[in-house]
Amino acid sequence: MTDASGSERLKRAKGISEGTPSSLPDHLIRATAAEGKIRVVGLVATQAVQEARERHKLSYVATVALGRAMSAALLLAANLKRRQARINLQLKGNGPLGNIWVDAGLDGTVRGYVSNPAIELPLTAESKLDVGQAVGRYGYLHVLRDLGYGQPYTSAVELVSGEVGDDITYYLSSSEQIPSAVLLGVNLDSQRVRAAGGVLLQLMPGAPASLIPEMEARLAKVEEFSPMLACGGGLRELLQLCLGDLDLKIAPEMRTIRFYCKCNSDRVKGALRMLGRDELLDMIHTDKGAEAVCQFCNEVYRISEDELRSIVAEMSATP
């Protein structure tokens, strides 16, 4: 943003507010409702989204878009079976934000980035951040499921709105053929993310289709759930508000959520080896070293000239 008036308008936007940020730890919980006919997953990912915002220097609208995608990927990953299983989301729309990439695991780890993190757009007529316009109304949502064994499973659907939640709901109903209702939210102020998270309701096999509009209506009751989290409301309390009179049973287990990237200097050095001896020698003579930036976490790795020479020596010694 380039002027104070623009900043003030953004502060007044729905989803942006000033005040004390939520101190709730990032976590995921599971539950059932309607006598076990509805599967429920809810999560808080405030610190994870804040770390993504800081690492990538995200604008307001980029923070909300990536935060929604991170929460969505974590919700989908929660239904995987093996601890090493992971979900990859790619939203490739025609908007100025470019592409969104997110990687999340059953273990609660998540990372992600956007192509154009600094982009900002005018607010909508309802004074909301225009995530759909930033992502784009036309394009595709790609979902890769790595189950931890065999070949990963990939599917794609057209974007419905670019708002992320609608697109995930459409993917689940059309590709996975699971009637679902998804609620995603990010609440932030000029300093930090105050609350972020999501709720996923899914019909269990054999459940009556009449429960589908019921699920949608229940989530509509807590449409502004991220501001509620930001004001100190707990995730369990929010689920009680949404489903408390529908035989809600919350599992006692709670899974920790955190931003985590598996990049490290050894991986960077391994990637440099792939460039070949001649390319590395050119780096030594021209650049006196090498620099690499991880796209997912924006971590900068600097490989010294001596380290490059060691890599070349190892390559030369290998038959």
Curated annotation (Swiss-Prot):
Gene Ontology molecular function terms on file: protein folding chaperone; unfolded protein binding
Residues of the signal peptide: none
An example Gene Ontology CC term for this record: cytoplasm
Pfam families to which the protein is assigned, alphabetical: HSP33
Superkingdom assignment: Bacteria
Keyword terms: Chaperone, Cytoplasm, Disulfide bond, Redox-active center, Zinc
Predominant subcellular localization, coarse grouping: cytoplasm
Biased composition (Basic and acidic residues): 1-10
Annotated InterPro entries: Heat_shock_Hsp33 (IPR000397), Heat_shock_Hsp33_C (IPR016154), Heat_shock_Hsp33_N (IPR016153)
Segments for region (Disordered): 1-25
Post-translational modification: Under oxidizing conditions two disulfide bonds are formed involving the reactive cysteines. Under reducing conditions zinc is bound to the reactive cysteines and the protein is inactive.
GO biological process: protein refolding
Keyword Cytoplasm attributed: yes
Cellular compartments annotated: Cytoplasm
Function (record text): Redox regulated molecular chaperone. Protects both thermally unfolding and oxidatively damaged proteins from irreversible aggregation. Plays an important role in the bacterial defense system toward oxidative stress.
Family: Belongs to the HSP33 family.
Name listed for the protein in its UniProt record: 33 kDa chaperonin
